[in-house]
Amino acid sequence: MKVKKGGGGTGSGAEPVPGASNRSAEPTREPGAEAESGSESEPEPGPGPRLGPLQGKQPIGPEDVLGLQRITGDYLCSPEENIYKIDFVRFKIRDMDSGTVLFEIKKPPVSERLPINRRDLDPNAGRFVRYQFTPAFLRLRQVGATVEFTVGDKPVNNFRMIERHYFRNQLLKSFDFHFGFCIPSSKNTCEHIYDFPPLSEELISEMIRHPYETQSDSFYFVDDRLVMHNKADYSYSGTP
């Protein structure tokens, strides 16, 4: 797949935030996943879900999430709705100017993964990740996010990701990436490019002082129907 640049609108009254979910696709850690660089920690339990305007709506399309003005309080689809068996197995973030790898995580081969007791498994496990970056991350101009993913035995048409970033529930930036068509039973690699304008010193200071109040929703669509929803939050203080 070709290298693609992020697009989409910005929230009013704020600069875009350089926090690529990490997940441009899905930088989640499954049981036994191996982090190679960067820092990721287990999230603390948060408040209960807040029911939003899309809660219970079916199907959910791109235009629905593009209208959201705050982080969602809960997941807008269940893991079972990923009928295409899309599985993100590797994720890497790098500074495009220096080539420095800022974060990388990958799943081990299926044969090396630890057995899982399905009865004890959280149904939302692997859908949330917490990132810890240094303040220098907020001054980067361009970041590349490489994702490697596999698909099941169904063709994936018009695969698209919309990723929306918020600071204190104010929309900062919306990215819109099109993966296109994926053939059945294939492994795919794609690098998305996130362009960041300079941030004001005031905003940088606020984001450093308030870790994990920068959050993102990553929505994945096939044929304009939501099939996956992941979440992330970010600290730029350089400490857990």
From Swiss-Prot:
One of the Pfam families matching this protein, by short name: GMP_PDE_delta
InterPro entries: Ig_E-set, PDE6D_unc-119_myristoyl-bd, PDED_dom, PDED_dom_sf
Free-text disruption phenotype from the record: Mice develop a slowly progressive retinal degeneration, characterized by mottling in the fundus, mild thinning of the photoreceptor layer, and increase in apoptosis as early as 6 months, dramatic acceleration at approximately 17 months, and virtual obliteration of the photoreceptors by 20 months. Phenotypes are due to defects in protein trafficking, such as Gnat1 mislocalization.
Keyword Calcium: no
SUPFAM superfamilies: E set domains (SSF81296)
Domain of life: Eukaryota
GO cellular component, one term: centrosome
NADP is among the record's keywords: no
GO biological process: endocytosis; lipoprotein transport; mitotic cytokinesis; negative regulation of caveolin-mediated endocytosis; negative regulation of clathrin-dependent endocytosis; visual perception
Entry comment on modification after translation: Phosphorylation suppresses its interaction with KLHL18 and down-regulates its KLHL18-mediated degradation. Phosphorylated more under light conditions than dark conditions. Dephosphorylated by calcineurin.
Positions of the UniProt region annotated as Disordered: 1-62
Composition-biased stretches (Gly residues): 1-12
GO molecular function annotation: lipid binding
Tissue specificity as recorded in UniProt: Localized in photoreceptor synapses in the outer plexiform layer of the retina.
Annotated binding of tetradecanoate, by residue: Y131
Modified residues (Phosphoserine): S37, S39, S41
Keywords: Cone-rod dystrophy, Cytoplasm, Cytoskeleton, Endocytosis, Lipid-binding, Phosphoprotein, Protein transport, Sensory transduction, Transport, Vision
Subcellular location: Cytoplasm, Cytoskeleton, Microtubule organizing center, Centrosome; Cytoplasm, Cytoskeleton, Spindle; Cytoplasm, Cytoskeleton, Spindle pole
Function, as annotated: Involved in synaptic functions in photoreceptor cells, the signal transduction in immune cells as a Src family kinase activator, endosome recycling, the uptake of bacteria and endocytosis, protein trafficking in sensory neurons and as lipid-binding chaperone with specificity for a diverse subset of myristoylated proteins. Specifically binds the myristoyl moiety of a subset of N-terminally myristoylated proteins and is required for their localization. Binds myristoylated GNAT1 and is required for G-protein localization and trafficking in sensory neurons.
Family indicated by similarity: Belongs to the PDE6D/unc-119 family.
Subunit composition and interactions: May interact with GTP-bound ARL1. Interacts with ARL2 and ARL3 (GTP-bound forms); this promotes the release of myristoylated cargo proteins. Found in a complex with ARL3, RP2 and UNC119; RP2 induces hydrolysis of GTP ARL3 in the complex, leading to the release of UNC119. Interacts with NPHP3 (when myristoylated). Interacts with CYS1 (when myristoylated). Interacts with MACIR; interaction only takes place when UNC119 is not liganded with myristoylated proteins. Interacts with CABP4; in the absence of calcium. Interacts with DNM1; leading to a decrease of DNM1 GTPase activity.
PANTHER family xref list: PROTEIN UNC-119 HOMOLOG A, RETINAL PROTEIN 4
Domain remarks: Adopts an immunoglobulin-like beta-sandwich fold forming a hydrophobic cavity that captures N-terminally myristoylated target peptides. Phe residues within the hydrophobic beta sandwich are required for myristate binding.
Protein name: Protein unc-119 homolog A
